[in-house]
Amino acid sequence: TPVDFNTQADALINCQRAARVAGGTVMDRPEWLTVAPDNSAVFCTLTNNSGRGVADPANPRIRNLHGHILKFSEEGNSPLATKFSWEIFLTAGDPALAAGGSNLVGDIEGDTFSSPDGLRIDPEGRMWVQTDHSVPGNSGVDGTTIDQAFGHNAMFYVDQQNKQSKRFLVGPLGCEITGLAYTPDLTTFFVNIQHPTGDWPVAGEAPRSSTIVVRRTDSQPVGNCQRPGGGRAR
């Protein structure tokens, strides 16, 4: 190997290379982990890997331009388990890109996206996915940029049961949506807007990374579609 592992410190400092030597699976740019509030599963975003030439079960698409999400479940739903199972929860992409190959299509139901990055499941079980595709980016189809295929980076709600995706908010030009925190009652979300371009957030001034606040005014949790007493919230 290009690294001499003489001590444990060598392995810790060069952990990626050490993992390769140990036979670890090379993943497609793992980014965020989140744990379901009932501790039943762990999810991991694999943002993309345009350089993948050989697929494997956990990274099933060569030239994986749009990424995927993995789900891990401990045997017997026990924190003491020594074994776990895993599945590909979702593959990102868009059927409109099928002309460029089946590896670009994905299996998202509803609002499609590329390059899942930020990931969190709130205490009521709502999964929130934040994206980080390059700008303008390569969609995989000649003449179509990622911006043209998917728009700006955004934040999505994804139903864990039917995998239906709904776009929640869209970031300004050039940004990555990353980071999510919330108040205990879930009526207020704090979302980070990182490295925007143009003149956001103040017109005519240099762009600045910022944290925005999203607040429900009817005392309901952000993402809850039901109003008190019936009817759907907007």
Regions found by a protein language model. Name each.
Residues T1-R234:
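Sequence/structural signature of beta-propeller domains
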